[in-house]
């Protein structure tokens, strides 16, 4: 987990992890928070083990790479700090999915189809977001897993070379990792484990004060998408739906 301010969200996230049934070791990189986050991590009133490091806020993906490389676990789970886990078995369910044949990446939000330009097709999204999860239990195969929460075998992440730091602030990194997993002959899965996501507040902080920040962010997203679609032109478009599901989606899209 990488954090920069957002103390209230981080505290709520860490509190929600108390009930997790699967043992885990949390690694948090604090990228220069000035709102009490550092102090929270220093006193850390939670029962699970923590490794806390400090970094800069120039490249969050680089921070995540440094964080997961500090671990010695068989699996690595990347989690946004603005999430709250409701299902105590959320991690167990991710690990169970990764035990399925050819599984390589598991998460809680994703889409079954990516266009040639790298954009997802909205009607193929499946997720565990509350209040209305849409993914069928126990899991469904997808073309990509969103970075809000994803779990991957450490050896696979290492063989891929880690997260591609060229994307900067999250944009495109989840699509990139997902197709890299598929390139390695593995499948991506979205698991049924309900959770709350409080929605990109780190990235959008300050948009209401300075509209220029939003324009800059939009430009970064467009650049990241172009980078991704160029890098994986051999894999795009990507559609993991079966024939029956494609026909059903086609009919739904055309019915009034």
Residues covered by each model-derived region:
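Short, acidic, metal-binding catalytic loop of nucleotide-sugar glycosyltransferases
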Residues: 15-24
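A conserved acidic beta->alpha catalytic loop
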Residues: 30-39
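Glycine-rich, basic loop-to-helix element that forms the pyrophosphate-binding segment
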Residues: 54-71
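Short aromatic/hydrophobic "clamp" motif used to bind/position activated sugar donors
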Residues: 76
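Conserved donor NDP-sugar-binding/catalytic core segment of glycosyltransferases
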Residues: 84, 88-121
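Donor nucleotide-sugar recognition loop
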Residues: 84, 145, 158-196
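A recurrent flexible, glycine/aromatic-enriched loop bordering the glycosyltransferase active site
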Residues: 132-152, 170
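Active-site-adjacent helix/loop segment of glycosyltransferases
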Residues: 176-256
């Amino acid at each position: 987990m990488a954090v920069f301010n957002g103390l209230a969200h981080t505290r709520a996230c860490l509190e929600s992890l108390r009930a997790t049934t699967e043992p885990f070791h949390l690694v948090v990189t604090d990228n220069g928070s000035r709102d009490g986050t550092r102090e929270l991590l220093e006193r850390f009133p939670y029962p699970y083990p923590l490794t806390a490091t400090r970094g800069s806020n120039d490249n969050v993906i680089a921070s995540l790479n440094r964080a997961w490389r500090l671990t010695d676990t068989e699996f690595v789970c990347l989690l946004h700090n603005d999430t709250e886990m409701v299902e105590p078995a959320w991690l167990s369910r991710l690990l169970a999915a990764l035990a399925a044949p050819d599984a390589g990446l598991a998460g809680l939000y994703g889409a079954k189809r990516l266009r040639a330009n790298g954009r997802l097709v909205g009607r193929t999204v499946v997720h565990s977001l509350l209040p209305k999860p849409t993914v069928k239990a126990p899991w469904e195969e997808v073309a990509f897993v969103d970075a809000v929460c994803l779990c991957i075998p450490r050896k696979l992440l290492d063989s891929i070379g880690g997260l591609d730091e060229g994307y900067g602030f999250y944009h495109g990194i989840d699509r990139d990792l997902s197709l890299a997993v598929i390139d390695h002959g593995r499948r991506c899965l979205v698991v049924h484990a309900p959770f709350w996501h409080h929605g990109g507040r780190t990235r959008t902080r300050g948009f209401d004060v300075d509209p220029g920040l939003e324009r800059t962010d939009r430009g970064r997203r467009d650049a990241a998408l172009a980078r991704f679609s160029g890098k994986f032109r051999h894999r795009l478009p990507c559609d993991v739906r079966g024939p029956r599901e494609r026909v059903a989606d086609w009919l739904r899209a055309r019915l009034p």
